[in-house]
Amino acid sequence: MAGLSSSQIPDGEFTAVVYRLIRDSRYSEAVQLLSAELQGSPRSRAGLSLLAYCYYRLQEFELAAECYEQLSQMHPELEQYRLYQAQALYKACLYPEATRVAFLLDNPTYQTRVLRLQAAIKYSEGDLPGARSLVEQLLSGEGAEDSGGENDYDGQINLGCLLYKEGHYEAACSKFLAALQASGYQPDISYNLALAYYSSRQYAPALKHIADIIERGIRQHPELGVGMTTEGIDVRSVGNTIVLHQTALVEAFNLKAAIEYQLRNYEAAQEALTDMPPRAEEELDPVTLHNQALMNMDAKPTEGFEKLQFLLQQNPFPPETFGNLLLLYCKYEYFDLAADVLAENAHLTYKFLTPYLYDFLDAMITCQTAPEEAFIKLDGLAGMLTEQLRRLTIQVQDARHSRDDESAKKAVNDYDETLEKYIPVLMAQAKIYWNLENYPMVEKIFRKSVEFCNDHDVWKLNVAHVLFMQENKYKEAIGFYEPIVKKNYDNILSVSAIVLANLCVSYIMTSQNEEAEELMRKIEKEEEQLSYDDPDKKIYHLCIVNLVIGTLYCAKGNYDFGISRVIKSLEPYHKKLGTDTWYYAKRCFLSLLENMSKHTIMLRDSVIQECVQFLEHCELYGRSIPAIIEQPLEEERMHTGKNTVTYESRKLRALIYEIIGWNM
């Protein structure tokens, strides 16, 4: 029936055809027919009513509200149209307009429904006292003419939502559990419960309820194509149907992604997003779009920024969008853009940024022009947070001493949250001195924070780095690198390649060559196993370890051994040559060429020939490999022909020929 026009429908069959389309959930086609029919009969009550219904089912809430507004003007005696208009306006997030229309309803028949709607509006606007007052009216049975008062599980849900917004997550869980027991399984209530568990950092029960939602969704609605995209199966969009909304699958997968992301299981987080029912990008809801931007930021930063900037123009957008966009601008050092967004959106600053986050961003932006002033701002923030951490430490001790498990649990959660705020402030302070290469001062900053951070992986990793960079503290660096590596020894490729490389160098510099060789054998064995399982996968860990060791020998002046190590580390080229590995290799070659041009070193002809052959291989295999990863929002892009390993390897080869006087 696709493309059917009014003229093709036999006389007397129009209504039956429209109802069949609605029955089959083919609302878009019904809208086409009804819109055409209403051009001839614009005051048709039946036509407008059906059109409004179809728009509502298509989630075109503003258009539905317009239809209901026309109906309420044509038939002011039928107050249900005004109620439907208010509901559609609420769904369209037009809260002031929805409130205005709802206040016009004074029919006792609709009083309970109006109270529910007004409570929902106030809740969405963030007016929690106003929402609570209306919910309590409903629970007391006021305005109960049409439904006998708020039924038990509806009341529990409403109270649970209010408690959740107020930050009382445990109490919210109790309400949602009570509602679930009273109503039987409901996907939306299960999702609310999972969300409350997530917010109270109880990830295991949250994941249990998410798994339940997903399992039931797959079993009851196989047509929604859950997991198809992850499996690489090309499937068409399932659209934003009412059925999809009722399953709560989209919400469940987004929450699963958030939990995995918090647990640093980044691949699992990305998989959760691709597992959800397939939809076209223009059909994605704001939360999914926001999560896609965050999860894929490392691989597709330009797209990520575009999505977050787009969301900021929408009404509504996920409340985390504003802060995350600003933090990412700072991470990628777009401080001017962060400052512009803050200045242009002062009204969002007070609504979506906590005082802590605002002060942190302000200090980060100040770093660009006034690092000393920024350090003072960060120091003030750090002082406030350390006071909170000390106070919470005492609370934890007191609660444990009095065997108050509930208070102890809450204090521990609060401590962890405060520590997660403190670490970025500390790292921002350290980075100011790191950029000045004042490594002793960085070490001093870290030592001041040992009281709170000695068990934190990020802190331990950065302490290791700063000890390593001082070149006379390799033994101390080993003390911090080793636990990180041993913690993940059975899955050693999950450890950053630079951590493994720095540990190997530290072993070599402290004459622990056997330990270095053992670690490299372990990495090689893991890489061989991974290559066996996935022959096409590029793995760079051992390559980068060898490159860093080669760089070390070059830095010590032993270019014969160092350059040979660098060259061998990139074999086979089709698997080992990449942007990161080329970066390490070319640094050694540039250092070599600089010293050759100054005549401070002499190389054997065989080594020079080896260098030329290496660069020829890089030229051959590096045609599609970027020499550098450009900043995502760079206005002036490099010439695509110049930003390749091939181009840079030719340049280096030409320099070799020039220095040794060979004719090209």
UniProtKB/Swiss-Prot annotation:
Signal peptide: none annotated. Pfam families: TPR_16. Its main location: other. The keyword Cell cycle does not apply. It comes from the Eukaryota. One of its GO terms (molecular function) is intraciliary transport particle B binding. One of its GO terms (cellular component) is axonemal microtubule. The keyword rRNA-binding does not apply. TPR repeats lie at residues 11-44, 45-78, 153-186, 188-220, 385-418, 423-456, 458-491, 543-576. It is found in: Cell projection, Cilium. Keywords: Cell projection, Cilium, Cilium biogenesis/degradation, Coiled coil, Repeat, TPR repeat. Transmembrane segments: none annotated. One of its GO terms (biological process) is intraciliary transport. Residues 507-534 form a coiled coil. Required for polyglutamylation of axonemal tubulin. Plays a role in anterograde intraflagellar transport (IFT), the process by which cilia precursors are transported from the base of the cilium to the site of their incorporation at the tip. Interacts with the IFT B complex components IFT27, IFT46, IFT74, IFT52, IFT57, IFT80, IFT81 and IFT88. Interacts with KIF17. Belongs to the TTC30/dfy-1/fleer family. This is Intraflagellar transport protein 70B. It comes from Rattus norvegicus (Rat). The lineage of its organism: Eukaryota, Metazoa, Chordata, Craniata, Vertebrata.
